[in-house]
Structure formats: C-alpha cells, structure tokens
Amino acid sequence: DAHVDRAEAAATAADAAFQALITDAAWGHVWARGTIPLRERSMLTIALLAGLGNDHELALHIRATANTGASEADVMEALLHVAVYAGIPRANHAIAIAKNTFAAMKDAR
C-alpha cells in the first residue's frame, strides 16, 4: 500500500518504533485478516474514526475507499450511525470532512 510505504519511508529515529508497531498491528494483522471483506472493514474504520474525532485519519480512510469498494453512499450511511451512537456534532463534522474529501477525489480524477 502506497500510504504505508510513504509512512515507513518518512519514519525517523524518533518515531521508527511507533511506525513499525502500527504497520505491523494495523496493516500486518487487522487489515490482512480475511474474516471481514475490505469494504466492511473500511466502513467500520470510518465510523470509529468519525466517532472518536480523528479527523486526519478519517479523511485518509475516506480516500482509501477508492481501493476498498466502499462507495460515497456507504460512507454517508455509516456516518448516520455515527450520529446516533457517537453524537450529532461528531457526525456533522465527519460529514463535512467526507464531502470535502470526496469532492477533492473527484477533482483529482
């Protein structure tokens, strides 16, 4: 994955151990498991990031939907769940991020 490759290349002595940990845990174990299809794993991740208010990572994972099979409609549906289970303000902010991210993705095509 290009994102992982860029993150590993940008690692310094200060954060190399952290980068190795997240690469191994997230990409080497969780994302590599075949028990949940990538589309659903992507939706779970987006909902969790939105609910937790992790804006930078949310935009990153929305951009990654181009590779996971999750559509814009899928993401917006997941964010409706965020509104109910994590709160309207979190979902409102996440929807704004999603709209901006999808618009930028369309402009880049």
Over which residues does each language-model region extend?
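Acidic, glycine/proline-rich low-complexity segments that act as flexible tails and inter-domain linkers
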Residues: D1-R39, N67, N92-R109
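C-terminal structural segments of small proteins and small subunits
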Residues: A83-A91
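Helical "substrate-binding/catalytic lid" subdomain
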Residues: I36, E40-M43, G53-N54
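Mid-chain, well-packed structural core segment of small domains
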Residues: G51-M76
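N-terminal alpha-helical segment
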Residues: T23, E40-S42, L58, V75
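Short, structured motif recognition centered on aromatic/hydrophobic residues
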Residues: R41-L49, L79
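Short alpha-helix boundary/capping elements
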Residues: A26, L48-N54, G87
